[in-house]
Amino acid sequence: MGPRYGGAPALLLPLLLLLQVSSGLCQEPEPCRPGFGADSYTFTVPRRHLERGRVLGRVSFEGCTGLPRTAYVSDDTRFKVGTDGVITVKRPLQLHKPEISFLVHAWDSSRRKLSTRVRLKAATHHHHHHHDAPSKTQTEVLTFPSSQHGLRRQKRDWVIPPISCPENEKGPFPKNLVQIKSNRDKEIKVFYSITGQGADAPPVGVFIIERETGWLKVTEPLDREQIAKYILYSHAVSSNGNAVEDPMEIVITVTDQNDNKPEFTQAVFQGSVTEGALPGTSVMQVTATDADDDVNTYNAAIAYSILTQDPLLPSSMMFTINKDTGVISVLTTGLDREGVPMYTLVVQAADLQGEGLTTTATAVITVTDINDNPPIFNPTTYQGRVPENKANVEIAVLKVTDADVPDTPAWRAVYTILNNNNDQFVVTTDPVTNDGILKTTKGLDFEDKQQYVLYVTVVNVTPFEVILSTSTATVTVDVEDVNEAPIFIPCPKVVSIPEDFGVGQEITSYTAEDPDTYMEQRITYRIWRDAAGWLEVNPESGAIFTRAELDREDFEHVKNSTYEALIIAIDNGSPVATGTGTLLLVLSDVNDNGPIPEPRNMDFCQKNPQPHVINIIDPDLPPNTSPFTAELTHGASVNWTIEYNDPARESLILKPKKTLELGDYKINLKLTDNQNKDQVTTLDVFVCDCEGVVNSCKRTAPYAEAGLQVPAILGILGGILALLILILLLLLFVRRRRVVKEPLLPPEDDTRDNVYYYDEEGGGEEDQDFDLSQLHRGLDARPEVTRNDVAPTLLSVPQYRPRPANPDEIGNFIDENLKAADTDPTAPPYDSLLVFDYEGSGSEAASLSSLNSSESDQDQDYDYLNEWGNRFKKLADMYGGGEDD
C-alpha cells in the first residue's frame, strides 16, 4: 500500500488541500441578511397562571446594524421583550386557552420592520407528578467530548443536559446518579474526580465520585428550598496525574417535592365595602405564598376559597373569592351598615391548585356608610329677634337628626336659605353638634323692614345615594328698633373759601338727618376736632362760623390747601347716639406772604471770595410768587452786589464788590413777588480770613471787638467768684459765734403756783442727750443773789461733787449733789425768798427780786396786780391782803 501512494502523486495531495483551503479563504464573505433566527418560536409553560416577571424564552434577531442589542416590540401588552430578546410576563395573567400567540417586531439597519410569531403552550398536568420519579431501566452515562488534538477547551456550544435529583429522597445513601466515562479509558487507566459546590466547596461531601469507575453519587437527602441547583466539574486524569480530558461541567437540578404548605402574608386581612354595593364589586384581596417550585411543578399553584362567613345575614353567601387571584368581591345584594356593619370570613389557600396542602387566614370586611338617610329638622319652626344695625348676631339654633354615621360626610349637614335675596343672613354648621347657627351677615334696618320669614333647607356634604326628600324649616326674625346715630349728608362736605375769610362770618351749614323716623328727636351740633381752633358751630342750626383768621400757609394743619374738621351731631334718644361728619375747607390762596431768602447766614473768604446762591421762597401759590424782584437797601449795595441766577428769578447770586475787612456784615435785601408784595430781610454775612471757598471760619466773639481779651475776662470772673466765697465764709462764721439766749420767763399762757418751769407737761424727756456742762455750771458758778433786808449768816458751805468725766456716772453725780443741797444750812426756809442755784446765764431779764419798786423796807401796794388779769391773780392774793392779817 505504501508504494502505491509514493512518488509525485503522494506529494500532490497536500498541495490540493492547500489550494482548496486558500480558495476558501479568498472567497468574499456572505452579505449580512437581517431577520429573526426562526419564523416562529414555541415556548411551553408548566401552568396556566403566569405571574409577573416570569421568563418565557428568548428570540434572536440579526439587524445588520453592528450593535450588540436590538429593540423589540410585542403586539401583546401583557408581555415584554428585552433588548437581549428575553420575553417576560409584564403582569399576572391566566391562560384560558391551551395555546396563545403574539408577534414580536424588530427593525433592521434600513428601518425595515421584521416580525416573528411566539406561541405559548400550557404543559399537560399529571396528578402524580409530585411523587418520586420511577426508577430508570437503563443506566445513564456521561462521556467526555472527544478531542482530536489532545487536551483543549470544549466548545462553547456544547452543553451537558442537567441531571435531575429529587429532594427529600429516603435513600439508601450513597445513591448513584450518573456514571462518567472517558473515551480513552480503554487506552489508559483513567481516574475521576469532581470539584465545585457540594463536592469540595460548601456544602462539602454532598456529592462524591468513585475514582476508578466514575460513578457520581449523592450522599444525603437534598432540599430544593435551600439549594435548587448544583454546578460540578468532573476531571479525568491518568495514573501519572496528567489530564486526560478537559474538565466537564455537570449541572444537578434538585426537583421539587410538595413539602411546603402555602403561607398567607397576613393573619388578618382588613377590607371595606360600601353598603348597598352591587354584585361583582371588588372588596379586597388576600395573598399567600408557597416556597415550592412554581415554574416546573404545581406544588406552588395556590387556589383560594372561602370556608365560613359570620354572620350569615342577610345571606349565607354574601361574598365570593377568585380562586387564582384571591380577590374577594360582593356576590349578592343586601349589604346594609345599619343591619350588619361587619363580616368575618375564614379564607383558605391550597397548593396543587386546591388539591394539596392548605392554610387559613381571616378576612374582616367593614360595611361603610353611604348617604341613605336624610337630615331632618326637629322642630321645623323657629322664632328669633335681632337688634337693627348689628351684624354677626346669632338669631336661632336649628336642630337636625341624621341616622348616618356621625362625623362622616354622609352625616355632616349643609344648610341653605331659600329666600336670602340680599345675603343678609347665613347658616353655619356647628362642627360638634351638626346644628345650624343662623346669624346676620349685615345690619338690618328697622325702618326698612320689621320682620323677615326665612325658609331653610338641609342636605349632607355628600349627595344622597338614593332618592330622598329634603327637610325644610321656617324661621321668623323680628327686627328690634334701636336709637341710630344721625347721619351727615353729604359726608364729607367740601367748601371752598379764601384764606382771608372774615372772622365771625358763616362759612356753611352742615346738618345731619336722624334715620329713626318713628322717633321725634332733637339734634344738636358740636365741633369734635378743630386742630387749628378756627371754627365754631351753632349747636341748634349746625351753621359753621370762623372764630379766628384762616391761614392756608399753616402747613401743620393745612394739607394740600385743605383744612379738615370733624363735626358731631348728638340726638336726645336713649341711649344718646352720635354721628360724625367731615368738613373739608379748601382755602384759596391770598397774597399775604412776602418772599424770603434762603439761606440767611453765609460766610465769604476775604480773598477771591466764592459767590453764594440765594434761593427765594414764597409760601403763596402762583401768580403770587415768581418772578421775583430783588434790591439791596440801607447802603448794602456799597459793598455787595446781587444778580438773578435763572430766568424765573427764583434765585440770586450774592458776592462782594471789593475786598472787605474781616468781620460781620448785615445786608438788607428787599424781595418783591409778582403781585408787588415785598419784604425786607437781613442777611448775616461774615468775612473770613481765607481764600476762595470757605472751609472753616472762626467768628470773633463780640467782646473781642471791645478790646477785652479772653484772659482778662476770665480774670474778672475769677475775682468776682472769690469775693462771693469770702462773703459766704464770713456769714457762716458770724452765725457760729451768735449765742442763743434762753428765755427767763415761761410763755404768757403758762400759769403756775411757783416760778419753776420744766418745759414739759408729762411723758418724760424725749431728748436723752444731756448738756453736762450746764449741770456743772449750775453748781460751781452760781450767780450772786443778795438780800438787803436780812443779814447773812456765816455758815460752812457744803462740798458739791464735781461733774464726772464718765457720762455713765451721771446718776450717782445727781444723787450725791441733791443730798448735799438738802443738807445745805445756808438754804432759806420754804416761806422765804428762795435763792436758786441756776436760772440761766446771760439772760437780759432781771431776777424776781427786781419786782421791788423801792430799796426801802416800806410796805408796797400790790392791788394793781388785780388789774393785770388771771396770770397775776396768785401774786395779788399773796401780797394784796397782807394788811388784814
UniProtKB/Swiss-Prot annotation:
GO terms for molecular function: beta-catenin binding; cadherin binding; calcium ion binding. It is found in: Cell junction, Adherens junction; Cell membrane; Endosome; Golgi apparatus, trans-Golgi network. Residues 27-156 form a propeptide. It is a single-pass type I membrane protein. Residues 157-712 are extracellular. Residues 121-131 have a biased composition (Basic residues). Keywords: Calcium, Cell adhesion, Cell junction, Cell membrane, Cleavage on pair of basic residues, Cytoplasm, Disulfide bond, Endosome, Glycoprotein, Golgi apparatus, Membrane, Metal-binding, Phosphoprotein, Repeat, Signal, Transmembrane, Transmembrane helix, Ubl conjugation. Its main location: other. Ca(2+) 3 binds at D290. The modification Phosphoserine is found at S773, S796, S841, S843, S849. The lineage of its organism: Eukaryota, Metazoa, Chordata, Craniata, Vertebrata. During apoptosis or with calcium influx, cleaved by a membrane-bound metalloproteinase (ADAM10), PS1/gamma-secretase and caspase-3. Processing by the metalloproteinase, induced by calcium influx, causes disruption of cell-cell adhesion and the subsequent release of beta-catenin into the cytoplasm. The residual membrane-tethered cleavage product is rapidly degraded via an intracellular proteolytic pathway. Cleavage by caspase-3 releases the cytoplasmic tail resulting in disintegration of the actin microfilament system. N-glycosylation at Asn-639 is essential for expression, folding and trafficking. Addition of bisecting N-acetylglucosamine by MGAT3 modulates its cell membrane location. Residues 734-885 are cytoplasmic. Residues 158-264, 265-377, 378-488, 489-597, 607-688 form the Cadherin domain. Residues 121-141, 750-770, 792-811 are annotated as: Disordered. The keyword Metal-binding applies. Residues 1-26 form the signal peptide. Three calcium ions are usually bound at the interface of each cadherin domain and strengthen the connections, imparting a strong curvature to the full-length ectodomain. Glycans are attached at S282, T287, T360, T472, T474, T511, N560, T578, T580, T582, N639. Ca(2+) 1 binds at D259. Ca(2+) 2 binds at D259. Homodimer; disulfide-linked. Component of an E-cadherin/ catenin adhesion complex composed of at least E-cadherin/CDH1, beta-catenin/CTNNB1 or gamma-catenin/JUP, and potentially alpha-catenin/CTNNA1; the complex is located to adherens junctions. Found in a complex composed of CDH1, RAP1A and PKP3; PKP3 acts as a scaffold protein within the complex, the complex is required for CDH1 localization to mature desmosome cell junctions. Interacts with the TRPV4 and CTNNB1 complex. Interacts with CTNND1. The modification Phosphotyrosine is found at Y756, Y757, Y758. GO terms for cellular component: adherens junction; apical junction complex; catenin complex; cell-cell junction; cytoplasm; desmosome; endosome; flotillin complex. This is Cadherin-1. InterPro entries: Cadherin, Cadherin-like_dom, Cadherin-like_sf, Cadherin_CS, Cadherin_pro_dom, Cadherin_Y-type_LIR, Catenin-bd_sf. Residues 814-885 are annotated as: Required for binding alpha, beta and gamma catenins.
